[in-house]
Design a protein with these regions (language model features):
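Active-site beta-strand->loop->alpha-helix modules in alpha/beta enzyme cores, enriched
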Residues: 2-122
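The feature marks non-catalytic terminal segments
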Residues: 49, 87-91, 95, 122-171
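Short, Lys/Arg-enriched, disordered terminal segments
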Residues: 1-2, 171
């Protein structure tokens, strides 16, 4: 089965999705990003991280601008084309792993990605710790933050002691 992890920003897939991806190797994964391109330094670093694990990446290329989340409105682009781009990518996959409806912690880009794919028949969402239907841990040594120097500080801030995530799976 084909699975898509569709997230807003390059670091989101490691912060929120790596546990699920690691525990579901039977799925043929692709990582999709709302923001950045594979030629941006952050995009290139994350694409290389997933390439080393045999996972392809797709970047939709929308600009990631801090003012969007601060002002709770899109300042550089309209939401409709972004939602359409997310859906156009997602509709070709059997399983979608993505942000929850609240945008995990209220981030406007995360909320947009969720809205765009919520109608898919098999959506797994990130959940607050221990509030999902399943909680998974990434075994130590699966990755190191040395692989992701541009993203390490933010990833470390979410996973201080161990890399553990909760998810809500369709019932």
């Amino acid at each position: 089965m084909k699975a898509l992890c569709l997230v807003a920003h390059p670091d989101d897939c490691v912060i929120f999705a790596l546990s699920y991806i690691h525990h579901h190797p039977e799925l043929s994964w692709t990582i999709g990003y709302l923001t950045y391109t594979d030629s941006d330094p952050r995009g290139a670093e994350m694409a290389a991280f997933w390439q080393r694990r045999g996972i392809n990446t797709v970047f939709l290329g929308f600009e990631d601008h801090w003012q969007d989340d601060e002002q709770k409105q899109f300042t550089r682009w309209r939401s409709e084309p972004a939602e359409a781009a997310c859906w156009n990518l997602a509709q070709h996959y059997d399983v979608i792993l993505t942000h929850d409806a609240d945008g995990d912690y209220g981030h406007i880009h995360h909320q947009l990605v969720h809205r765009a794919v919520a109608r898919h028949y098999h959506v797994v969402t990130f959940a607050p710790h221990n509030q999902g239907t399943v909680t998974l841990t990434v075994p130590p040594g699966t990755y190191t933050l040395d692989e992701l120097p541009m993203h390490g500080d933010i990833i470390r801030s979410f996973h201080i002691d161990q890399h553990r995530n909760s998810y809500k799976e369709p019932q």
